[in-house]
Curated annotation (Swiss-Prot):
UniProt-annotated stretches for the region Disordered: 190-276
Top-level lineage group: Eukaryota
Lineage: Eukaryota, Metazoa, Chordata, Craniata, Vertebrata
Organism name: Bos taurus (Bovine)
Main localisation: nucleus
Record's GO cellular component terms: nucleolus; preribosome, large subunit precursor
Phosphoserine: modified positions: S197, S200, S228, S231
Name of the molecule in the record: Protein MAK16 homolog
Cross-link (Glycyl lysine isopeptide (Lys-Gly) (interchain with G-Cter in SUMO2)): K55, K151
Protein localization: Nucleus, Nucleolus
Length: 298
């Protein structure tokens, strides 16, 4: 038969309890079924045959109850009741199940349930909220990265200074070619100079053309023409037409004569500005004949 006073005298005062933690001010209990976490007579789960507590498992709250009738059966010592997710309905369930329990246990169960629900709500909020992940770095790696950053910054500043200096020299025509350095910047500078020189040349040409046109005289036709002038022009056109017909007849007759001469003579001589006329030369041939007497003696 279980006696709560004997158990408390044994565990609480005289002998050792594995769940007890003593400090300078107070003693605490590490038992998982402890209602308050304090080591005292009313809160001890081992020295109270009628006891109740609240536990949380995987985000769900349960009410655990112990009575003296099941003290002889350790396998069925605790009765578990699942509480509702709604806070008010869960409190009603606690009141219904702990109606014959001491008021202290009932009040502490409600207090424990409120604390558990509060930290569950906080856990849900933290999981939904985006958090920073802190990654530990060794001091060696940190120093190495800092040195690399400083070296890269110094190298970038040097490159910019060298580029500016070389661009200024190129603009001042200090030297013609650039060696051992990226030439992209110089190509850009040369393109800008060429574009500026082309625009200045075009402007100078336009100015010269405008100066040349100054004082130039031109003749422009008049739109108003008298009728007498028109009749004179018509007579001139008739005369020009008759003269053109005569010239066409003459040219056709000359072409026919040329074709006949070409047939008789053969090939036509070459025409061109480089051809020279040959001088007229008369050639005479003389034949000598020996006398007949000389021929007989021989």
């Amino acid at each position: 038969m279980q006696s709560d006073d004997v158990i408390w005298d044994t565990l609480g005062n005289k002998q050792f309890c594995s769940f007890k933690i003593r400090t300078k001010t107070q003693s605490f209990c590490r038992n998982e079924y402890s209602l308050t976490g304090l080591c005292n007579r009313s809160s001890c789960p081992l020295a109270n045959s009628q006891y109740a507590t609240i536990k949380e498992e995987k985000g769900q709250c349960y009410l655990y109850m112990k009575v003296i009738e099941r003290a002889a059966f350790p396998r069925r010592l605790w009765e578990r009741v699942r509480l509702h997710k709604n806070y008010e309905k869960a409190l009603e369930q606690i009141d219904e199940n702990l109606i014959y329990w001491p008021r202290f246990i009932r009040h502490k169960c409600k207090q424990r349930f409120t604390k558990i629900t509060q930290y569950l709500i906080r856990i849900r909020k933290l999981t939904l909220k985006r958090q920073r992940k802190l990654v530990p770095l060794s001091k060696k790696v940190e120093r190495r990265e800092k040195r690399r950053e400083e070296k890269a910054l110094i190298a970038a500043q040097l490159d910019n200074a060298i580029e500016k200096e070389l661009l200024e020299r190129l603009k001042q025509d200090t030297y013609g070619d650039i060696y051992n350095f990226p030439i992209h910047a110089f190509d850009k500078a040369l393109e800008q100079q060429e574009a500026e020189s082309d625009s200045s040349d075009a402007e100078e040409k336009d100015d010269e053309e405008d100066e040349e046109d100054v004082g130039k005289r031109e003749f422009v036709e008049d739109d108003e023409v008298d009728e007498s002038d028109i009749s004179d022009f018509e007579d001139m056109d008739k005369l020009d037409a008759s003269s053109d017909e005569d010239q066409d007849d003459k040219s056709s007759s000359e072409e026919e004569e040329k074709t006949l001469d070409a047939k008789h003579k053969g090939k036509t001589p070459l025409k061109g500005p480089l051809r020279r006329k040959r001088a007229y030369v008369e050639i005479e041939y003389e034949q000598e004949t020996e006398p007949a007497a000389k021929a007989k003696t021989t």
